[in-house]
């Protein structure tokens, strides 16, 4: 497949009107590179674990970070901004992750989508953690969905790629979704150059798409197993996983997420820092490429903090749990 065919294939998978591949290290960078968030726009974002990307990537815009993914928080941060769905703008953007932020929050995308349209805001969803297998943001009300493709490519792509998808504007009974129509017009006119993919990159992405569903289900199933192990482990605390009834967004997640509750689990250490914990583990837990078959750990609050974020691979969860257990007992 060439780039156009891959973009068309992604659009079909995402239920999108149009899709574009972008070279970018992460979704906020891709959103900035697309150029659809323009000077004079306001960007309201919940991404407390990615605040620096918004502080430096949208210099000409009015960026407001909110502390909660709730409708009330976004509406409050949008007051006083005169906006519409006219292409000329200025535009109001709402940004959330389908799973993200500290604690792996799951916003009510249906409620946010409805409120965004009432406020004349364009809802953008970073769908990287849940991915298109685990969440359908465009169906739930997003005007734009972006997803880093590390896991889609099984960590084999030589560059960091992001897929951007815009919602269809045709609703039931021949009604037009003004938000989606505005987003598509901005998307079509952004002037971003078509991505120049090598034959190797195209092959990796094509192969990744063909095996996507089975691999994603494996990631999700292993995350659930590891979350249940950690929740029962007395050597850690505050296990955050949307599939656990203790998670603050569990009820919302059951209606937003599909095929499980994503590949990520967070927990807090009790007796050591993240950096000390990493030193007790095999290097592959930290050095394996993102999105690959090996379970990977990070420290979202820094190595001096106590929070660990785990992304389940497709490796044996019993072996992973045993390795974690041995490190926790040292």
Task: Show which residues each predicted segment covers.
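Generic surface-pattern signal
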Residues: 79-83, 191, 279-286, 329
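Short intrinsically disordered coil segments
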Residues: 177-181, 282, 327
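Conserved PLP-enzyme active-site core in the AAT-like
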Residues: 9-235
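N-terminal entrance/gating region of PLP-dependent enzymes' catalytic architecture
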Residues: 1-5, 12
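Conserved C-terminal alpha-helix-loop-beta "cap" of PLP-dependent enzymes
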Residues: 231, 235-326
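A structural alpha-helix within SAM-dependent methyltransferase catalytic domains
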Residues: 113, 325-328
């Amino acid at each position: 497949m060439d780039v156009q065919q891959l973009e068309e294939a992604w659009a079909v998978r995402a239920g999108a009107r149009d899709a574009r591949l972008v070279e970018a290290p992460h979704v906020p960078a891709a959103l900035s590179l697309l150029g659809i968030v323009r000077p004079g726009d306001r960007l309201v974002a919940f991404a407390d674990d990615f605040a620096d990307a918004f502080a430096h990537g949208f210099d000409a815009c009015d960026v407001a970070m909110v502390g909660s993914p709730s409708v009330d928080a976004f509406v409050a941060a949008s007051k006083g901004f005169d906006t519409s769905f006219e292409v000329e703008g200025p535009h109001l953007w709402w940004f959330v992750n389908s799973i993200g932020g500290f604690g792996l929050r799951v916003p009510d995308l249906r409620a946010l989508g409805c409120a965004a349209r009432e406020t004349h805001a364009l809802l953008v969803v970073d769908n990287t953690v849940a991915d298109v297998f685990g969440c359908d943001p465009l169906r739930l009300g997003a005007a734009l969905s972006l997803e880093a493709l590390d896991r889609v490519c099984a960590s084999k792509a030589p560059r960091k790629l992001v897929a951007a998808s815009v919602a269809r504007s045709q609703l039931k009974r021949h009604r037009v979704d003004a938000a989606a129509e505005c987003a598509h017009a901005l998307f079509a006119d952004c002037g971003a150059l078509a991505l120049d993919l090598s034959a190797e990159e195209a092959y990796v992405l094509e192969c990744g798409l063909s095996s996507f569903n089975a691999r994603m289900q494996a990631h999700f199933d292993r995350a659930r197993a590891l979350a249940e192990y950690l929740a029962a482990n007395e050597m850690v605390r505050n296990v955050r996983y949307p599939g656990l009834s203790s998670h603050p967004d569990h009820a919302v997640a059951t209606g937003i997420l599909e095929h499980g509750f994503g590949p990520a689990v967070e927990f807090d250490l009790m007796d050591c820092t993240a950096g000390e914990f990493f030193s007790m583990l095999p290097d592959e837990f930290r050095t394996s490429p993102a999105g690959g078959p090996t379970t990977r750990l990070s420290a979202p609050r820094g190595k001096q903090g106590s929070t660990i974020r785990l992304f389940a691979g497709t490796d044996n969860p019993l072996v992973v749990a045993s390795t974690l257990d041995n490190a926790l007992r040292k």
